[in-house]
């Protein structure tokens, strides 16, 4: 299937790769269907793009690529909502805020996006743990 993004142009995807966010994503509660696109020339970053709004695409990454000690505990509600059966089925990504100055690029470690890769259900959660920041610099000083 094909989708035209305002920013990224034509995107080809397979319908089986559509990720459903029943609760939407923070700031985009009404948008439920997204695809995750590899950005090979910009590894380890990916594009999480809405299929319902051609202007909504979020740059995301695995927090573990930058913060090896990042940890979170999923609540029973999240495990049930996403129908998670095995830890290996869980993908964790965080949104990126870009900046022309590399030291000002940040990620939201307090609001990770959890995806069950076995059934393509996703949900953004808010961690109560105050040690993680909403705008955590990706690159140290």
UniProtKB/Swiss-Prot annotation:
Role: Acts as an anti-CsrA protein, binds CsrA and prevents it from repressing translation of its target genes, one of which is flagellin. Binds to flagellin and participates in the assembly of the flagellum.
Protein name per UniProt: Flagellar assembly factor FliW
Gene: fliW
NCBIfam families linked: PRK13285.1-1 (NF009793)
Lineage: Bacteria, Bacillati, Bacillota, Clostridia, Eubacteriales
UniProtKB keywords: Bacterial flagellum biogenesis, Chaperone, Cytoplasm, Translation regulation
Localization of this protein: Cytoplasm
A biological-process GO annotation: regulation of translation
Subunit structure: Interacts with translational regulator CsrA and flagellin(s).
InterPro entries: Flagellar_assembly_factor_FliW, Flagellar_assmbl_FliW_dom_sf
């Amino acid at each position: 299937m094909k989708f035209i993004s305002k920013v990224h142009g034509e995107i080809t995807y397979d319908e089986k790769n559509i990720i459903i966010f029943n609760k939407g994503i923070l700031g985009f509660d009404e948008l439920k269907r997204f695809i995750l696109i590899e950005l090979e020339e910009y590894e380890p970053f990916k594009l999480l793009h809405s299929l319902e709004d051609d202007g909504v695409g979020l740059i995301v990454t695995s927090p573990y690529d930058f913060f090896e000690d990042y940890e979170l505990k999923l609540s029973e509600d999240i495990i049930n909502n996403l129908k998670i059966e095995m830890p290996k089925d869980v993908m964790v990504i965080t949104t990126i805020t870009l900046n022309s100055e590399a030291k000002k690029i940040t990620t939201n470690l307090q609001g990770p996006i959890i995806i069950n890769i076995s059934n393509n259900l996703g949900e953004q959660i808010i961690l109560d743990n105050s040690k993680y920041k909403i705008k955590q610099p990706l690159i140290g000083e």
